[in-house]
Curated annotation (Swiss-Prot):
GO terms for molecular function: actin binding. Residues 46-202 form the PID domain. Stimulates guanine exchange activity of SOS1. May play a role in membrane ruffling and remodeling of the actin cytoskeleton. In the cochlea, is required for stereocilia maintenance in adult hair cells. This is Epidermal growth factor receptor kinase substrate 8-like protein 2. GO terms for cellular component: cytoplasm; ruffle membrane; stereocilium bundle; stereocilium tip; vesicle. Keywords: Cell projection, Cytoplasm, Phosphoprotein, SH3 domain. The keyword Cytoplasm applies. It comes from Pongo abelii (Sumatran orangutan). The modification Phosphoserine is found at S240, S450, S571. The modification Phosphothreonine is found at T304, T470. SUPFAM superfamilies: PH domain-like, SH3-domain. PROSITE patterns: SH3. Residues 452-467 have a biased composition (Polar residues). Interacts with ABI1. Part of a complex that contains SOS1, ABI1 and EPS8L2. Associates with F-actin.
Length: 716
């Protein structure tokens, strides 16, 4: 079996025990100090023992079945793997003494391999033939091996020529009995000492800038392409002085896109590491089958290190970057293409499934609360995941499904600052202002202030001519700041209207109660909550998922709509809609005519044999669900309807109005196929409530007209 190196999908890995950066990132003074310290600790010559920091690239068996019969064949295969980016670097230490070559674990100093000098058949350098410019090649075969192994090492801190000269001098002394090595080491020691005062020369290719990746390059696969030009519709310059200039918005989008690319690179790098660890484990088992009992198999130490799984901290880091990528996909979904955000989310959940299974289940992922998901990210996942992905998402728990705006204030979730393998540091201003960090935070002080402070806030709003009511908790509109990205388009000059699809009952003074089929004017079209104004002049916030489009003519003749339930106070001082085609006197005359016609019809009804008017009411269910129901009543209603525990758990956190506002497709996305039954039961319950409401309204209307008729009769 051949032993190929693993793929480094991200050309830049941390200088940890597994993987190392192939590019050169900008270094801080602290990083420079640490690298010099590491250089001096890793590359030392003491007496007749020298030690070098190297990266193991690959080990091949020289075998015809693997198409490797010579060193040149092995080099050719390594070049081929490098061109396809299928080489995985493994950091270790190479020690040379007068008896053997030893490979040590860079962290534990544990011996991985020990090649006695008589088993080293060949030492050679491979320079500038692949992306690793300074490579050392060793051909080793012990007495029990039928075929030799070819090992490749990248000498990233001390040139391969120096290491090669050291090994050759040790081999010459061993074979010929000469004492060449002390003189060789003396020269090398002087060169290494000189290097300790300067930064080692950069090795490997420079990192490819994310924004310049070509669509056909290997690094560009599943990556975010160029953003949508800001000149396209939807990105016109906004007229408000508070909106971001185009240049600032474009710069912010570019930074967020780069953060997203770094996160995707690190996730892909981690998945490649898992896959190559599995391959190494398989090769290790195959080699162990042919070894003698009690003796290590050839290359067993290196393969054991490669097969070592990541630590729990590294799994957590990958889960955090996955959540960060989900947040950024939702935020940039209108700005990225080739591939789109909707396509990338599926590429993200495939590796996520693999990682969850590798770490033994969702327990580690469930513990990852930082970063939380934004409201847009949760909505984005609900709208794009397929059933299998939805099940995986639900298994990860509240820290993945509950948005930041609904998360408890205590314990506080810290700001998430990712550390990328490439060494690039994301801008702090972008992270600090991100929705998944600030959503809902503006409403916290109002809840925590004293009654006196709360009263002063209300008074200041009352006396301010431009003040507007604060929206509910997660309905806060974006903060008016030149550096705040707004997720909604500016309101056009022409008035905009929407039609209410479902009844909604306000839960506080900031929300607006609306009825189905009512047409209202849009004051603010935010992300989740829209500020609307009713015909009576009342303004408040309404969830956007119960709104539908309304034509201007629908709002132009509001008093002629047959299905309209809410008319507002019919007073002579009632403010007319601007689009009403007539003056106030004509309207009042028309209303008098309508009233007279109604009185005549009611008089005719009274002349007929009297009927006992009674509204039939259905028997109430054992667990009623109304528009005033809280989460506990919703949970009780779901349990009474014998829904599964998963459905009760997912929907039991909603209030009655929130549950009634969900349509069939939204319920199917959250509940799967059982969502159809939930929708059916909600439809029945909604009809029952409407029947109750319409009955009481009709009784009240009839009583009102009856009183009016009596007064008219008395006046005449």
């Amino acid at each position: 079996m051949s032993q190929s190196g693993t793929m480094s999908c991200c050309p830049g890995a941390t200088n940890g025990s597994l993987g190392r950066s192939d590019g050169v990132a900008k270094m801080s003074p602290k990083d420079l100090f640490e690298q010099r310290k590491k250089y001096s600790n890793s590359n030392v010559i003491m007496h007749e023992t020298s030690q070098y920091h190297v990266q193991h690239l690959a080990t091949f068996i020289m075998d015809k079945s693997e198409a490797i019969t010579s060193v040149d064949d092995a080099i050719r295969k390594l070049v081929q793997l490098s061109s396809k980016e299928k080489i995985w670097t493994q950091e270790m230490l190479l020690q040379v003494n007068d008896q053997s070559l030893r490979l040590l674990d860079i962290e534990s100093q544990e011996e991985l391999e020990n090649f006695p000098l008589p088993t080293v058949q060949r030492s050679q350098t491979v320079l500038n033939q692949l992306r690793y410019p300074s490579v050392l090649l060793l051909v080793c075969q012990d007495s029990e091996q039928s075929k030799p192994d070819v090992h490749f090492f990248h000498c990233d801190e001390v040139e391969a020529e120096l290491v090669h000269e050291d090994i050759e001098s040790a081999l010459a002394d061993c074979r010929l009995g000469k004492k060449m090595r002390p003189q060789t080491l003396k020269g090398h020691q002087e060169k290494i000492r000189q290097r300790q005062s300067i930064l080692p020369p950069p090795q490997g290719p420079a990192p490819i800038p994310f924004q310049h990746r070509g669509g056909d390059s290997p690094q560009a696969k599943n990556r975010v392409g160029p953003q949508v030009p800001l000149s396209e519709p939807g990105f016109r310059r906004r007229e408000s002085q508070e909106e971001e200039p185009r240049a600032l918005l474009a710069q912010k989008i570019e930074k967020e896109t780069q953060i997203l690319n770094c996160a995707l690179d690190d996730i892909e790098w981690f998945v490649a590491r898992l896959q190559k660890a599995a391959e190494a484990f398989k090769q290790l088992n195959q080699r162990k089958k042919g070894k003698k009992k009690g003796k290590k198999a050839p290359a067993e130490g290196v393969l054991t290190l490669r097969a070592r799984p990541p630590s729990e901290g590294e799994f957590i880091d990958c889960f955090q970057k996955t959540k960060l990528a989900i947040n950024l996909l939702a935020k940039l979904q209108k700005h990225i293409q080739n591939p789109s955000a909707a396509e990338l989310v599926h590429f993200l959940f495939g590796p996520l499934d693999l990682i969850v299974n590798t770490c033994g289940g969702p327990d580690i992922a469930r513990s990852v609360s930082c970063p939380l998901l934004s409201r847009d990210a949760v909505d984005f996942l609900r709208g794009h995941l397929v059933p299998k992905e939805m099940s995986l998402w639900e298994s990860l728990g509240e820290s993945w499904m509950r948005p930041r705006s609904e998360w408890p204030w205590e314990p506080q979730v810290p700001l998430y600052v990712p550390k990328f393998h490439s060494g690039w540091e994301p801008p702090m201003d972008v992270l600090q202002e991100a929705p998944w960090e600030v959503e809902g935070l503006a409403s916290a002080p109002i809840e925590e202030v004293s009654p006196v402070s709360r009263q002063s806030i209300r008074n200041s709003q009352k006396h301010s001519p431009t003040s507007e009511p604060t929206p509910p908790g997660d309905a806060l509109p974006p903060v008016s700041s030149p550096h705040t990205h707004r997720g909604y388009q500016p309101t056009p000059a022409m008035a905009k209207y929407v039609k209410i699809l479902y009844d909604f009952t306000a839960r506080n003074a900031n929300e607006l109660s609306v009825l189905k089929d009512e047409v209202l004017e849009v004051l603010e079209d935010g992300r989740q909550w829209w500020k609307l104004r009713s015909r009576s002049g009342q303004a408040g916030y309404v969830p956007c998922n119960i709104l539908g489009e309304a034509r201007p003519e629908d709002a132009g003749a509001p008093f002629e709509q047959a299905g309209q339930k809410y008319w507002g106070p019919a007073s002579p001082t009632h403010k007319l809609p601007p689009s009403f085609p007539g003056n106030k006197d004509e309207l009042m005359q028309h209303m008098d005519e309508v009233n007279d016609e109604l009185i005549r019809k009611i008089s005719n009804i009274r002349a007929q044999p009297q009927r006992h008017f009674r509204v039939e009411r259905s028997q109430p269910v054992s667990q009623p669900l109304t528009y005033e129901s809280g989460p506990d009543e919703v949970r009780a209603w779901l349990e009474a309807k014998a829904f599964s525990p998963r459905i009760v758990e997912n929907l039991g956190i909603l209030t009655g109005p929130q549950l009634f506002s969900l349509n069939k497709e939204e319920l199917k996305k959250v509940c799967g196929e059982e969502g159809v039954r939930v929708y059916s039961q909600l439809t029945v319950q909604k009809a029952f409530l409407e029947k109750q409401q319409s009955g009481s309204e009709l009784e009240e209307l009839m009583n009102k007209f009856h009183s009016m008729n009596q007064r008219r009769g008395e006046d005449s």
